[in-house]
Amino acid sequence: MKEQLEQLLAEAIGQLKAQGTIPADHSVNIQLDRPRDKSHGDFATNLALMLAKPAKSNPRQLAEAIVAAVPENSLLSKMDIAGPGFINFTISQDQLKDQLTAMLNSDSLNVDVAEESKTIVIDYSSPNLAKEMHVGHLRSAIIGDAVSRVCEFLGHKVIRQNHVGDWGTQFGMLLAYMEALDNQSAEYELSNLETFYKAAKQRFDESEEFADRARQLVVKLQSGDEYCLKLWNQFIDVSLSHCQDVYDRLGVKLTRDDVMAESAYNDKLPGVIEHLREKGLLTEDQGAQCVFLEEYKGKEGEPLPIIVQKKGGGYLYATTDLAAIEYRQKELGGDHLMYFVDARQALHFDQIFTLARKAGFVEGDIQLNHYGFGTVMGKDGKPYKSRDGGVTKLADLLDEAERRALELLQQKTTDLSEEQQKRVAEVVGISSVKYADLSKNRTSDYVFDWNHMLTFEGNTAPYLLYAFTRVNSIFDRLGDTAFDRNADIILSDERELALANQLVRFNEVLHQVQDKAMPHFLCGFLFDLAGRFSSFYEACPILNQEDEALRNSRLKLSMLTANVLKQGLELLGIPTLEKM
């Protein structure tokens, strides 16, 4: 409906340009917002205020001209001018009912899918395989996963890329430690990667002989030595298995097939350097090969270097990222490359994207976007740590989430068996961790708070999961009793109308999530939907409604609410429960 209204306004502006009211060559950006005050209608625009100066007109008079120029239509029931020139629009009930019916009759809830499907390559998670995944890896994995699900739902081809770190000097240290252990000990110690890494690091720091051996093994590994590759493959296999366990528990759709590791680009890196040389972009600086871009300068005004090859011949992240960009466009056919990486890498990606275009690693109008995110903080305002002050392993965090959720459920009266309680606790616990993150603005830091995320009140996973079971319970009680699914929808009560207005926003919100890569818009929508359904449920009898037409209508509204909640949570990677 938002798109329809934008089209009507575009036609009105076109008419005013033709009349000379607005300069014909003036570019107009039509922006519609949702008013917080429901008395101001369903949509509002400040278009008249923005165009008043170029039109040399009083904003309110221009607003009147815009309203008069809107073509006759069935979309709107009312247009009002407020204050100095804001225009408020109210959607007609007939239009609302038609949209609700279309949503009920569609497996995809009548969401507008892309007319031309794009190939979107999404880089997310991408942990360093030298260690186990920790709490710092949470945001990339679940935000990237939610956005990829939404893009797929909106009709795009999504190619997931897990650009894991599996190369570099630290792997020499790990291989040297594996070599020093017998097979049985190595297998045992690899079961806890964090312990393994710490033990290897301690040996590296304390023994010069061990450190020398580690450096030798790095050189051998990078030159393709069969023995080193065997040890390395053994380590990588164990580490990837640890990652997959975490993805499976989190409900993240990444698999081994999505792994395109740093090492996969090794053979392409000499070609990257040669290509930059041919383009005349390389400069040698203290023995290293660098690119200096005028667009990025230091405090003294000097161009900042992008180092692509070290003095000793080794390559850096920048080199690998350039190779990956070229591969993702030219071999995977990406139209849009999305990167979900910590906000602290913003400058790195700005430089790499600029260089990729300048050097011709990408061609045409391909989109390159880095979507940074903030940090998970503790209550002390510092990055979240375990109780002993160390880094919290993600697997341990999920264990604690399940334990706390089980304790919460056991405090409530339930007819669930012990086994069912454990399953519900698993879903509630892990969903609470995910939702607490996804419901925050992606670009902001947030405080990790068990008490807040594991409550049945407010914008939390337990609240939404319970809201779904509450809607579902209506149909459990209805049982096999038939109701007329083709009955007219009636919106006679203000709570019915409020619920209907929220339901039809689903399409708009999903496109907002895709365009901004911001899952918190969907979380906010679902929270508002659950709240409006609760008000509707309390005020409007459903199963006990004697008027059959009203009863059928309210059952249809309830069914659509359940469908939207279920689909919305699924797009966030959160499974629903039939009972809690």
UniProtKB/Swiss-Prot annotation:
Can you state which reaction this protein catalyses? Answer: tRNA(Arg) + L-arginine + ATP = L-arginyl-tRNA(Arg) + AMP + diphosphate
Q: Which SMART domains match?
A: Arg_tRNA_synt_N, DALR_1
Q: Where is it mainly found?
A: cytoplasm
Q: Which SUPFAM superfamilies match?
A: Anticodon-binding domain of a subclass of class I aminoacyl-tRNA synthetases (SSF47323), Arginyl-tRNA synthetase (ArgRS), N-terminal 'additional' domain (SSF55190), Nucleotidylyl transferase (SSF52374)
Query: What Pfam families has UniProt attached to this entry?
Result: Arg_tRNA_synt_N (PF03485), DALR_1 (PF05746), tRNA-synt_1d (PF00750)
GO cellular component entries: cytoplasm
Is rRNA-binding given among the entry's keywords? no
Which stretch carries the motif 'HIGH' region? 127-137
Query: Could you say which EC number(s) this protein's record lists?
Result: 6.1.1.19
Assembly and partners are described as: Monomer.
* UniProt protein name: Arginine--tRNA ligase
**Coding gene?**
argS
